[in-house]
Design a protein with these regions (language model features):
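Long C-terminal interaction/binding lobes of large macromolecular proteins
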Residues: 1-193
Length: 193
C-alpha cells in the first residue's frame, strides 16, 4: 500500500557508473558490489548545513556523511578511491544544483571580474574516460600502484596542515636563526614521513 506522501519522497536525479568499475573495492565499500547505475540524490537541508560546518569539513566527516546521504549504495565513503570520489562529488553537485556551475575569476592584469559557467557533464566525461594504471615499469623494475582512498588523503591533508602551522609558528618566533633550524629540520622530516 502506498502513501499519498510517496510522491514527495526524495527521488534520484541521476544514475552513475563508477570510473574504477569497482577495481580494488571489497564488499564493505559499495552495497551488493554494484558499481554501475548507482542512484544519486540531491543534497537535503541537513547536507547543506553539514557542508558549511568547518570542523566537519576539515575532518572529512561532512563529505563522508553527504556521500552516504546522496549515494546510499556507498556503505563506506572512507574507502572510496580519489577519482571515484571526484566523480561522486560532481554527480552530487549536478543532482543538487544542475549541470552548470558558475565560476568567477579576476584578471591579474586589469582586475576585471570574469563570470563563466562550467558544464559538469563534460568534467564527468573526462574523469570517466581516464584509464586506471595499476602498474608502471621503469627499466627492469615494475611498480604496483593503488590509488589513495578518501581516508588516506584526508589523513595526509590533516597531518600536512598541522605541520605547516607548526612551521609557521617557528618562523614567527623571536628566537635566533640558529635556534630555529633544529626545529625546522625536525618538522620537515616529519612532513616526509
Amino acid at each position: 500500500m502506498s502513501s499519498f506522501l510517496d510522491q514527495y519522497k526524495r527521488q534520484p536525479k541521476l544514475f552513475i557508473d563508477l570510473p574504477s568499475k569497482g577495481a580494488s573495492y571489497d564488499e564493505s565499500v559499495i552495497q551488493d558490489q554494484q558499481y554501475t547505475q548507482l542512484p544519486v540524490f540531491g543534497m537535503n537541508t541537513m547536507d547543506e548545513i553539514m557542508i558549511k560546518t568547518p570542523d566537519a569539513l576539515f575532518s572529512g566527516e561532512a563529505t563522508a556523511e553527504i556521500i552516504k546521504s546522496c549515494v546510499p549504495m556507498v556503505k563506506d565513503p572512507w574507502k572510496i578511491m580519489g577519482f571515484d570520489l571526484d566523480y561522486i562529488l560532481l554527480a552530487i553537485r549536478m543532482a543538487t544544483y544542475g549541470d552548470k556551475m558558475p565560476v568567477s575569476s579576476n584578471c591579474p592584469m586589469c582586475d576585471t571580474q570574469n563570470d563563466n559557467e562550467v558544464m559538469l557533464t563534460k568534467m564527468l566525461e573526462k574523469i570517466d574516460s581516464a584509464q586506471l594504471e595499476t602498474s608502471v615499469k621503469i627499466k627492469e623494475l615494475t611498480f604496483k600502484l593503488q590509488p589513495l582512498t578518501y581516508k588516506r588523503t584526508t589523513d595526509i591533508s590533516q597531518k600536512h596542515f598541522t605541520l605547516q602551522k607548526q612551521l609557521a609558528t617557528i618562523e614567527v618566533a623571536d628566537d635566533k636563526e640558529t635556534d630555529k633550524q633544529p626545529h625546522r629540520e625536525k618538522l620537515l622530516r616529519a612532513m616526509g614521513d
